[in-house]
Amino acid sequence: MLDINLLRKDLEGVVARLETRKSPQPFLDVERFTALEAERKAIQTRTEELQARRNSLSKQIGQLKAKGEDTAAVMAEVGGIGDGLKASAERLEVIQSELNALLMALPNLPQAGVPVGADEHANVEVRRWGQPRALDFAPKDHVDLGAPLGLDFETGAKLSGARFSFLRGPVARLHRALAQFMLDVQTQEHGYTECYTPYIVNREVLEGTGQLPKFEADMFWVTRGGDDDEATTQYLISTSEISLTNSVREQVLAADQLPIKLTAHSPCFRSEAGSAGRDTRGMIRQHQFDKVEMVQITTAEQSDAALEAMVGHAEAVLQKLELPYRVITLCTGDMGFGAAKTYDLEVWLPAQNTYREISSCSNCEAFQARRMQTRYKTAQGKNELVHTLNGSGLAVGRALVAVLENGQNADGSITIPAALRPYLGGLERLVA
């Protein structure tokens, strides 16, 4: 959530920065915001006047009583002022609620230096690593490579519908090995603390990280059974960023606790609303997929460097898996709702002859912290909002796709990256 004082000081500038994200979408009803602010100021001014008048009358009552004179008229006026103050307080509460709703619908402001553009075509490539392997045969995609190894979309569809998969045998083992390998890299080499988190969370948790209220259509939700008064709607997480980041909600942290670095492997559930017709074949876009997530909680001074480090932590996994990739800076129109700056890592897929996203690393600055009310105490004893960062380290299913396609041989076998072999009992190749 944005700082409302920023809008009060420079509404025109904030609106201009918001419009760079996906113009001409009107993120803020400026007319409504301005009207609410004007009414709020008028009520606050009137409240101060009434309070001053009440204080003056209270003194008069004391003086009248000391003289033995009648106080009924003055006390009646004080009572009327009390009614007016109560009505003002109630109206201010309504106004604040409406202002809060407007703020909750606003995305984060892009950092200075983020490329301005409407969509992915304006993203900027930063660097590449690795050379795509030259194949002397026509590459197969992961669907054809995975079928004899236990990658089964038919059973997934039979059980749950489109965009679900069923893994068995060698490919299921590879999937598990990848997740364990990623966790080990992040915990043993980069200092993250491994966590196991709930996959079902409450509404306020999703509001804290910014998925709600704007993106409810992208979520899966469940209703807990029981009596009517016990029935509760909760949500399946779309990423463990949600639970990891909210683990510090409504806390004041000590400065020496920061940065906090957390990681978790979890399934992720997404309805993929608006993705009809996109990536309908294979594992690239699923309703349920696994991901190893990285989260950092930092001070404002630490967050820019933390983002660069986090990108490096995701890159390390790809490099150890010997997978060619590139790093992209997302433009203003392609960034996620809560991000101030985002890097995407895209892995090379031979069958598609292109790079596809496998990790997204973002600095959300104080945007989520303000929603979660998470602060830290400075050396001067002042409470300041933390900064939050999140990144994929990596998407497990897409890593499996990349290992299958980049490791394929003419006979259909898959060469396992050397770093992954200890997690597969020393196995060097997957063979049907």
Curated annotation (Swiss-Prot):
Positions contributing to ATP binding: R270, S271, E272, E357, I358, S359, S360
Taxonomic superkingdom: Bacteria
EC number(s) on file: 6.1.1.11
Keyword Cytoplasm found: yes
Pfam name, any one: Seryl_tRNA_N
Record keywords, A-Z: Aminoacyl-tRNA synthetase, ATP-binding, Cytoplasm, Ligase, Nucleotide-binding, Protein biosynthesis
Protein localization: Cytoplasm
Main location: cytoplasm
Catalyzed reaction equations: tRNA(Ser) + L-serine + ATP = L-seryl-tRNA(Ser) + AMP + diphosphate + H(+); tRNA(Sec) + L-serine + ATP = L-seryl-tRNA(Sec) + AMP + diphosphate + H(+)
Annotated L-serine binding sites: T239, S240, E241, E293, S392
Pathways involved: Aminoacyl-tRNA biosynthesis; selenocysteinyl-tRNA(Sec) biosynthesis; L-seryl-tRNA(Sec) from L-serine and tRNA(Sec): step 1/1
Xref: CDD domains: SerRS_core (cd00770)
GO molecular function, a single term: ATP binding
GO CC annotation: cytoplasm
Cited InterPro entries: aa-tRNA-synt_IIb (IPR002314), aa-tRNA-synth_II (IPR006195), aa-tRNA-synth_II/BPL/LPL (IPR045864), Ser-tRNA-ligase_type_1 (IPR002317), Ser-tRNA-synth_1_N (IPR015866), SerRS_1_N_sf (IPR042103), SerRS_core (IPR033729), tRNA-bd_arm (IPR010978)
A Gene Ontology BP annotation from the UniProt entry: seryl-tRNA aminoacylation
Family in the record: Belongs to the class-II aminoacyl-tRNA synthetase family. Type-1 seryl-tRNA synthetase subfamily.
Function: Catalyzes the attachment of serine to tRNA(Ser). Is also able to aminoacylate tRNA(Sec) with serine, to form the misacylated tRNA L-seryl-tRNA(Sec), which will be further converted into selenocysteinyl-tRNA(Sec).
Assembly behavior: Homodimer. The tRNA molecule binds across the dimer.
Written domain comment of the UniProt record: Consists of two distinct domains, a catalytic core and a N-terminal extension that is involved in tRNA binding.
Protein name: Serine--tRNA ligase
